[in-house]
């Protein structure tokens, strides 16, 4: 329906993504989103000058990268107002010898505060949590915002699946894009790589690799983040996590309905309730359009339940510190 001459003009603002935390993951994600021409970006951090400097650096690359996306650096949550997607990457990274769970106490307060501030300015946004320990942080952000579960999720399974696919491709000497695999469960030592569903151009890897080799690749996937931390010594991975997050952002903003493993609040699926854990979901304009229940084997289902129990224990651990 066309508007009358006296009615106000209808403004179609470009989509905006707010990234809370301008560290290596956050700043690389800002670059990915802008250069894929997905949305304007607001990069927020508590360190004065840092997000502003990063935003200016990214702006100066626009002519070279052939896009015209706006990139704002700020220390003020008001500048994130009206974002379609909020990504929380703020928090301390792992150091050598640390597990993701070791970050619980330090990062929980950061994520809860970031979620509360961001939702106040973007009440209709979809939230993606990246901060570790991922599944617990996503649960706490869900509690802090009161959002329906379709609008809050964690990025873990996309990254873990990409690592599994990479290691399979390296072992077989094939193109990574030809490998399809899925990793469920928590983002940690108890993740559940689904080996029997992994394929190379439709051929199950069980027909290409022996059981011992597959188990070795599964273990390397479980330790994929720690391997990078040990090598770098000064932080963790950021290129692949940023790419994994940008894929989720793309599927939502472009309504691609991609089937991706993401951490989501479960309400009985897989026999699990009141826990956030990685399972296959379809991502579109509404965030999580649907949760997909796979027909897992007994051992896979048991591994997923063990993974969920670990997440629940950490949630309870955090809650106990708040009431003590």
UniProtKB/Swiss-Prot annotation:
SUPFAM superfamilies: LDH C-terminal domain-like, NAD(P)-binding Rossmann-fold domains. GO terms for biological process: lactate metabolic process; tricarboxylic acid cycle. Its EC number is 1.1.1.37. It is an enzyme of class 1 (oxidoreductase). GO terms for molecular function: L-lactate dehydrogenase activity; L-malate dehydrogenase (NAD+) activity. Belongs to the LDH/MDH superfamily. MDH type 3 family. HAMAP family: Malate_dehydrog_3. This is Malate dehydrogenase. The lineage of its organism: Bacteria, Bacillati, Cyanobacteriota, Cyanophyceae, Nostocales.
């Amino acid at each position: 329906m066309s508007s009358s001459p006296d009615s106000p003009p209808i403004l179609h603002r470009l989509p905006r993504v707010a990234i809370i935390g301008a560290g290596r993951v956050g700043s690389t994600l800002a670059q990915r989103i802008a250069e894929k021409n997905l949305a304007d970006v607001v990069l927020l951090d508590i360190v004065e000058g840092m997000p502003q400097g990063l935003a200016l650096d990214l702006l100066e690359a626009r002519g070279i990268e052939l896009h015209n996306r706006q990139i704002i650096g700020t220390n003020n949550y008001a500048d994130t107002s009206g974002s379609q997607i909020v990504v929380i990457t703020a928090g301390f990274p792992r150091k050598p010898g640390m597990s993701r769970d070791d970050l619980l106490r330090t990062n929980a307060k950061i994520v809860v505060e970031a979620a509360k501030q961001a939702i106040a300015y973007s009440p209709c946004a979809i939230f993606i949590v990246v901060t570790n320990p991922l599944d617990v942080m996503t649960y706490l952000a869900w509690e802090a915002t009161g959002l329906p579960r379709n609008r809050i999720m964690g990025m873990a399974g996309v990254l873990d699946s990409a690592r599994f696919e990479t290691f399979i491709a390296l072992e077989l000497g094939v193109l990574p894009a030809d490998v399809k695999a899925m990793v469920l469960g928590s983002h940690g030592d108890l993740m559940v790589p689904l080996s029997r569903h992994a394929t190379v151009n439709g051929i199950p890897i069980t027909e290409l690799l022996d059981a011992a080799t597959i188990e070795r690749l599964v273990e390397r996937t479980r330790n994929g983040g720690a391997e990078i931390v040990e090598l770098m010594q000064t932080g963790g991975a950021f290129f692949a996590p940023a790419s994994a997050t940008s894929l989720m952002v793309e599927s939502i903003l472009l309504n691609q309905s991609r089937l991706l493993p993401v951490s989501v609040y479960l309400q009985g699926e897989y026999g699990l309730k009141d826990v956030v854990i990685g399972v296959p979901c379809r991502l579109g304009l509404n965030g999580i359009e649907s949760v997909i229940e796979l027909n897992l084997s007994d051992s896979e289902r048991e591994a997923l339940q063990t993974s969920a129990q670990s997440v629940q224990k950490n949630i309870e651990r955090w809650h106990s510190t708040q009431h003590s």
